[in-house]
Amino acid sequence: METPGERYDYVIVGGGSAGCVLAHRLSARAACRVALVEAGDDTPPGAVPSEILDSYPMPVFCGNRWIWPDLAATATRDAPPRVYEQGRVMGGGSSINVQSANRGLPRDYDGWAEEGAQGWSWEDVLPYFRKLERDLDFPGHASHGADGPVAIRRIQPPDWPPFCHAFAQGLRRQGLAALKDQNAEFGDGYFPAAFSNENDRRVSSATAYLDAATRARPNLRIFSNTRVRRIVMEGNAARGVVAVDGSGRELRLLAGETVVCAGALQSPVLLMRAGIGDATALAQLGIASAVHLPGVGRHLQDHPTLTFCHFLAPRWRMPLERRRASMLAARLSSGVQGSEPSDLYLSSATRAAWHALGNRLGLFFLWCNRPYSRGRVELLTADPDTAPRVSLNLLDDDRDAARLMAGVRLLAGIVSAMGLSDDDQDFFPAAFSPRVKALSRFGRANARLTSMLGALLDAPAPLRRALIGRFFNGGRRMSGLLGDESALAAFVRRNVFGVWHASGTCRMGNAKDPYAVTDIEGRVHGTQALRVVDASLMPRLPSANTNIPTIMIAEKIADAMGRSAASRTPTAQPVYVDNQGDDDVH
């Protein structure tokens, strides 16, 4: 049964990293009616699930409750599809990710401006990075904010466990400099990783922006467990959305402006189902074209990534009751001819999983910054219940494969210099496979199984090697990969995966660019009253995790939308004021 249409000034589709920001900022104007529609559970103050609040994210990430379970992606053209974890919960990815608060490098945003997104250079975006954050370590620094909604902190060297000190030693012995602040000191080096966390608790976009005061605003309505089925179009104009709530009731939400914040995989899908995309491809699915924009769903990017583990003797392990496991990261240069400096990122974790087995394994994540390869999101059918085809096409550009191979060699040298073990077989490649993910799901059965497997890892080396070969690396040895170029190339292509930084599928740019989807304020080219505001807009994936850059994008566009609304209503309007950095940035 469909309810009569409810009218709002803005309907925001998706309560993720960007949507929560927009709900908070746009509803600050009391005369502005705002609806926020999220497909997953709400996480209101005082009722945030403990798994989401936890500083250690893997139990929530490896479960199915707060992700889109039917959303899958192929990593390369030859790879089978596998689940691609994207948040379906208030806060979106910021509620399930590793909490990294990485901005990237100035060149990333200067490149956006050069590619047609004028007004998005480093100088232009820095005020919004400052606006969003409350940096607990650098509150008075010119590059940092002191009163924004998102708390950001680092774990400093005096509080590092032995594994982190060993990692720092390995990086230092390979010639890398020690940096204090990855978000203000640029170039190669290692540093305490910044993350969105306070008092050892996650700070998601929902926690930061949808606080009790914001939720109490009478002009803001939040719909959770409500999935948008389609954008309502009249010609080229968006008039709102049709959604279905958890009880199966159909809702029609009318909007002066519809703002799509569903993420880089879901936002292009909503546009295409509304007839906005490649007209020929849509016609083949029986979808009438509203606006021909062939760039919708194209230009998909993610960081090509590999994982490695190292068996840890007892003196290198961290107590399980200490939750935060990732504390130290580094930027490196591959040295591949024609590549940019700082084109690799390396992070570590003192445990590979929440259980006794994972506590015996140190983890390394290696990825390529600013990948050259491009993928695509495509509709398979007009049915809104059918997931799209997601092709990451990682390593399609050989330059990405060459850089990742160089990164493996660099990592091997770093690990050798760490001094963790005399047995070189204790360091091994370990793909984040469906088997590993299944073993990482939180539960009593896995706790019992991993406790037994963990005890076996402490057995003599031959038994440990057999166990590692069966469960983690298929018998591959690092020495075999490093000594055989073709074996290393095959390993990289077989095991590469995305690190859940999907972006670029509705990229912003000049209207004369046939593959640009929006203008520099997220307004969809050729349409009226329709925007996209999320990681879809990124012209090129920055040298960073995507959460903080996405929040920055939302802050910047919310500011522009607020100024536009104010110019249409010149008489004084009441504005809700709080202590979350609500002043406009000019």
Predicted regions and their residues:
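N-terminal redox-cofactor-binding region of secreted/periplasmic oxidoreductases
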Residues: 1-586
